[in-house]
Amino acid sequence: MKKTLIAATAISLSAMALTACGSDSDSSAGADGDSGNGSITMGFAQVGAESGWRSANTKSIEDSAKEAGIDLKFSDAQQKQENQIKAIRSYIQQKVDVIAFSPVVETGWDTVLQEAKRANIPVILTDRAVDSEDTSLYKTFLGSDFVEEGQKAGQWLVDNAADSDVDGDGDIDVVQLEGTTGAAPAIDRGEGFADAISADPKISVIASQTGDFTRDGGKQVMESFLQSEKGIDVVFAHNDDMGLGAIEAIKAAGLTPGKDIKIITVDAVKDGMTALAAGEINYIVECNPLLGPQLMDLAEKVVAGEDVPERVVTEETTFDQEQAAEALPTREY
């Protein structure tokens, strides 16, 4: 199937019980918790709680729903697609006004999204996109440009190639800690990074494996890389948590993270920024999890039948060590 993530120009802008393998909650935010009073009811199917980024994202959504007076029905899929599909079907049966979700993986959503469409329930993709030829199955996408995030990470390495050849052999050997297999950020960040580093033939990815966006996963994969690969110069982790796990593995091997092995990550959550300020991470590309206010605004508009952009991309920045130290005192997540 041809990948279609929405062709429109990006616009930047600053229940029924589930099975035992998932969980859900009703975080009613309306004046009396009754959607019959004219307030909007949103069903939100979250990926899980696999990282600091995801926890901040969930809090932003819950807090923003309360502030907007939106009745929020929330489910945690624990990183399993089947749990998200069950949650979405539950929301359809409950006749919520709008469904939002962050897809665990890109593919396999057409059937359940067609069910939502037949029920006249609009869908908002949040944080992650889906791979579908039928873009009528959702109203809009809200989140980051993951390809650009990967490109920013790779461009920093190209720009700092001279300092990144740690072993001095003339080649820059990179190991990559990938996110969840099949997930949009893992696919797109990897593609963006590969595109950027192709400008310098000295840079190559010598090993790449999923750490599933978790700290433990990053640590385990990095331990394996340190045993199987010689002369690692750089780690590119698809999120901060895997990078923090890699730091633990590097230290356990008697090496100094940020010096003996350079580390580039994506997210810019507090733990990652703290490691960056301490010099254990060398560069972080921001991925803003605070999508709640924009999500509630979009939900109100689509329920009212208003036109919304097909793609809403958040504005984000990058951080080096000095910038991280400056930003940390006021960091929200």
Regions found by a protein language model. Name each.
Residues 2-8, 20-333:
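A residue-level marker of the well-folded mature domains of exported/periplasmic proteins
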Residues 11-12:
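Repetitive helical segments and hydrophobic/amphipathic motifs
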